[in-house]
Amino acid sequence: MKEDTVILLAEDDDGHATLTRMALREVGVNNQIIRFRDGQETVNFLCGTGQGPSREADVHYLLLLDLRMPKVDGISVLRRIRQDEQLRRMPVVVLSTTDNPHEIKTCKGLHCSCYVVKAAGYEAFAAALQQVKPFLEHSQTPWTTGQS
């Protein structure tokens, strides 16, 4: 597993963020995690806009993306990522509390790497997060644009 891949966790709910961190550790994922509390923070980091920190060009990233966030929702974040030449290959795992077929279809249409429903129980959620591991193994980042 690529432990140098940084996991970006876009999750506004403190409880869900804590459970996600714990569940990842439980399934053996020990990568650095950077958390964003809303979609705008996530976009600012990825695109280098705003006042805060931004992504580093030579770092591998994997985004765990909640759909229901303030300021900018997860689907808008995913759409923005897929429209950006330097971001579009970044693996994005959607974490959602719903298994709504329309939302799943929308996310798959925007080429999310995986759609994980946040299971009601902790053990089931931890098991579901096993799906994240392959994306750490085969990270497509950092991104190259053909320029040196």
Q: Which role does the model predict for each range below?
A:
Residues 21, 35-62:
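Acidic, metal-coordinating helix/loop segments flanking the phosphotransfer/catalytic sites
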Residues 71-72, 81:
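Hydrophobic residue at a beta-alpha junction
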